[in-house]
């Protein structure tokens, strides 16, 4: 689960992480009032959406007066903010965060996430703050400092100091950085976060270490332990299809292609997407209906796929083990009839009750394109999407 910058800073504040003062605003007048509360000097007006790169898209502006803060908020609220992470449609800005300005001496990067190759939490730091860290890692991997944390000891002071020295810090700034990194680590662990990222982490002219921006993601499977964090979910920032999928316990991720996919099993779903790509097509989604789906769940999955206007063809790839092919077939028929299927549908079934499933589809009066293996199914789906 993702949350907004202002929410992440609210959490980090509780763990002693230094963040600038700021106030949320949902109207231009509220933004003006927030700037006045901050003293009426220089402030930053920041669009709150679940995406990075806001500054490049016009989503972060400096205001030198409360009146200017109101003007910036007026321009931002309601705009479709486009960044490299939003896609071409952009995301609507519904709220802004007005934050006090500070005199910046240096911009750095500090982040924490799980290194799945090693099976440990990795703390990463870089002198290249305020820019796309993925780009830095790709072009200048030597500029990324890393420390791997033992779950038995947690982040040790010597590790935080080693990062600070690697960033070129000295004197009181080292002490402040160690305190900052320790607070960030404590917040990460205590909240079951999957990502905690400060970009940029700034060193002010006065030597303070501040989180100028903050991003936190959380493990959905641990949210039952954190009702306060679960309450921070913003449905307006989530894809409606993904929200609907969660209601039916479906694993769905929207992508940019035009071939809808419905598969049982995450591994088979990823393999299906790979074969579609190898066949010259682009998958429109990842969708795993799981091993114990019933007809209603399959129907819901089918409707979610078809609700994407970019989908030109659908590929259903089912290997029936616990999931029976006849259940999938009945769900396909029910959903196709309910939504009035008008795009090509390619179905590949194999496994338990496969003959019964094929018979159900054959007698459904639907224009279904059958396939006997995954390669054939992918090729037919790509051809159908191109012809649509």
UniProtKB/Swiss-Prot annotation:
It comes from the Bacteria. One of its GO terms (molecular function) is succinate-CoA ligase (ADP-forming) activity. One of its GO terms (biological process) is tricarboxylic acid cycle. It catalyses: succinate + ATP + CoA = succinyl-CoA + ADP + phosphate; GTP + succinate + CoA = succinyl-CoA + GDP + phosphate. The lineage of its organism: Bacteria, Pseudomonadati, Myxococcota, Myxococcia, Myxococcales. It holds the Pfam family ATP-grasp_2. It comes from Anaeromyxobacter dehalogenans (strain 2CP-C). HAMAP family: Succ_CoA_beta. Residues 9-244 form the ATP-grasp domain. Binds 1 Mg(2+) ion per subunit. Its EC number is 6.2.1.5. Its cofactor is Mg(2+). This is Succinate--CoA ligase [ADP-forming] subunit beta.
